[in-house]
């Protein structure tokens, strides 16, 4: 939470506008509905939403976009009720891939690299058991792996915790191909998955792993700034269409 607040505080917006950092659950007074209420109380009529999630395959993005009225129905059943909302919503994209994200990942694992020609970076993501969402996870993480490889100059592959593919992929690169495996967790913050689940899946294998998540990283502010500019352009394009 603090890391996201710090990244947002560094934004230098071209236009003055109020900003709310909201969370899906557990943070009292800072839930999504709280943020909407505070913005609309200021007279806001258009809200730019930046979903701070690693992948388009997250079911949370699906349910949040539905609850914000961006889509008529969720792709997966949800308990999340539609929010009280009068403003028009412009919904951005999660991290997924792209050079900023690749550089964040590379910066986190760069200290573990000793001999790039003999190494492979293995991106490890959460994944999904749900059809449709798994395909989005695969599409995003495979694209990110290619970009990380371009940025780092090190062979980069990927695996998901769900369905389990981490152990076999790491074993393949280490035992069959003779590469040193550097594991990069695709998680925004430290927690159960980075400290417990990933090491458990890799038990018995040789690998390098710091457990460092993607955040904090200064490039998150750059990524958010780009999202805001793109959403503002969409908003202005829509306004011109409405006025014609």
Roles of regions detected by a PLM:
Residues 1-244:
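Extended amphipathic ligand-handling, pore-lining, and cofactor/metal-binding catalytic surfaces
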